[in-house]
Every structure is written in C-alpha cells, then in structure tokens.
Amino acid sequence: MRPARIRRTSFGRFRNPRLWLFVAGGIVVALAAGAGVTGLIGRWARWGFVEFKMPNRTDIPVAVVVARDGTVWFTLEASDAVGRLRNGVIQKVGTGRENLEPLGLAVDAEGSAWYTNARARSITRISADGAVTSFPLSTPVARLGRLSVAADGAVWFAEPTTVSVTRLKDGVFMRYTVGPLSPVGSSNVGPFGVAVDPQGTVWATLQNANKLARIRPDGEMAVFEVPTPRSGLGDLAVDGRGAIWLLESGANKVARFAGGRFEEFSVPTPNAGLTALAVAPDGAAWFTELRAHKLGRVRDGIITEFTLPRSDARPFGIAVDARNNVWYTDLSGWIGRLAAERARGG
C-alpha cells in the first residue's frame, strides 16, 4: 500500500447561516433583497464556500450531478420530487412517485437527469423541460446502487437484487450477472458503484466480494481483487486518463486502479465515513467524509481535507463541474459549493 502524504485545511467554527426562501407556484425562490443571499456568500467567500438551504425542513438531498450547462441536479430522499439548482435558485421538479434511496444519478448529453428509485422499482428520466419518463423493472422488489450514462446514451446501474450490473437503452433492460444469485446479504456480491469509461467499458464495485468488476463493450467480464480485505467498497469514478478511483469505506481508504494494479491512500481522519466520489477535470479525486464533516481531495498522492463551514454538516453526495467547482449534498438540508480557486489550493 502506498501511504498518502497528508495536508489538512480547516476553516474553523462558524455560525449557522440562513438562506431565506419561499415557495411561489411550486417554484422555490431565493430572497435576494437585503443581506439574505448576499450575506451568505460574503460571509464565507474568503473560505470559498457557498451553501444553499433546502426550502423545507424535511428535504434530504442525496446524490448530486452537474449538467454541461451548469445545472446542478440532486435527488431527494422520501420526496416526490427531484431538485435542481440554477442561477442560485433551487427548484423542485415533481416526479409523481416518492423516492426511496435514490442513490444513482447522472445526466446525459442532452441534459436530462436519470436516477434510481427503489420504491417505484424504476429508472426515471427527467428532461430539461421537466418531462418525466419512468422505466419499470421486472422484479417485485428492487435494491439499486449507483448509476452512470455512457457516451452512446446507455444507462448503466447496479442492481443487487439480481446480482447484476444492468444496462438500459432504447427502453430495453439487459442484465450482466456479476455473481451467484442468492439472497441480498453477505452471500450476495453486492454490486454498488458504477462508472463507464470513454471506451464504453463499464466498471463496478462488488461490495461483499471485495472486488472491482470490468465489463467490456463485447460483454467480456473480469474481476480484480482489492488488496485490503473486507475494505467495504463503495462509490467509484473514472478520470481523464482512464484510471479507476474507488472508495474503501470500511478501510477508510481511497484507491486508484490503473495498469492492472491498485494504489491505496489512507484517509487521515479515522472512521471518516466515506460516502461518495467524483473526479475533477483537473484530475483530482474528491470524496465526502460524512462523519468528519469534511470533503477530501487526492492529488499527486497527497490527501487534503477541507472542513465544512457548519459543525453539524453531513456531506453525502459530491460532483465537480466543468470549471472544477466542487458541489456536495448535505443530509441536514443543504447544497454546497467549494469554489474552484479554493479547491485547487488548500
């Protein structure tokens, strides 16, 4: 294992800021008058953070992704809507079905958002104009992991219920079995993270098998054993050079797989609670530390941690936009952004 050099960035303790919002005609509107939004941005600008409060106390943002046009999409737990943030304004787009564990979220080339909904047993698409289309799964029960969209428009997602990594294209599902069919539990390999590289090869983490799976465009499958036993594999992402980054949540590590070998980097904060991973255009790998109230970055073998402004923060999802701004969801009811200028430093 390659130990990581460590850097820490702390922003101290802050009071809980407020972004005042109201609902008009079903659309959430931010009050920009006075010191509302301006005060929030100004107060944290020196540390590079901006955060947006959810309109309702019951709103729990989960997964997050950024479209090419800069729209920030995010899923909401136990809600009949998906959220989006544009020009500093949060909107909730109704879906007609309540979400349960909407962990998978991605956007396609046309700007439509795709997400998983275990309760509805479906994969759902929301177009930029708000049109909703759902594709029901055939199983009576669904347990779903992450989701990714390939360059050809195919939607790939983890389906532990059927021990499969599944493709949805042109309304048709095709399952690629990655382990023996058995009850979802310790005997199930538990596919969870999914990502597609530019060549169309699909990568997935098999949580209980402690392996990284590869599915090539011709259907050939292979698996690679992770060096640390019982590492608790989670999210994964592909960088611009084709290297695979993955979280070892149980081992408190971030790993990189390239050229047939793994490198592992230990997170300096013990038991940090690693939940999500994203790779920036500049090549840095970013991850969330739910229990530590931090974001983490791996760059050139160095881990840098960024403490979030609020001491009660619970960062869960993460994404990086085309300008290298880092976006994250906070289960306590916030969407946050770490500015690219600050994200590059630390």
Feature annotation, model-predicted:
Residues 53-80:
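Beta-strand-rich domains and repeat architectures in extracellular enzymes and scaffolds
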Residues 53-57, 94-98, 136-140, 177-186, ...:
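Surface loop/turn motifs at the tips and blade-to-blade linkers of beta-strand repeat domains
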Residues 60, 78, 101, 119, ...:
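Beta-rich catalytic cores
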Residues 66-69, 107-110, 149-152, 196-199, ...:
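Residue-level detector of Asp-centered blade-edge/turn motifs that repeat once per structural unit
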Residues 72-78, 113-119, 155-161, 202-208, ...:
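Conserved beta-strand positions in repeat-built beta-propeller and related beta-rich domains
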Residues 85-89, 126-131, 168-172, 215-220, ...:
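Short loop/turn segments that connect beta-strands within beta-propeller blades
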Residues 314-346:
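Blade-level signature of beta-propeller repeat domains, shared across WD40, Kelch, NHL, RCC1
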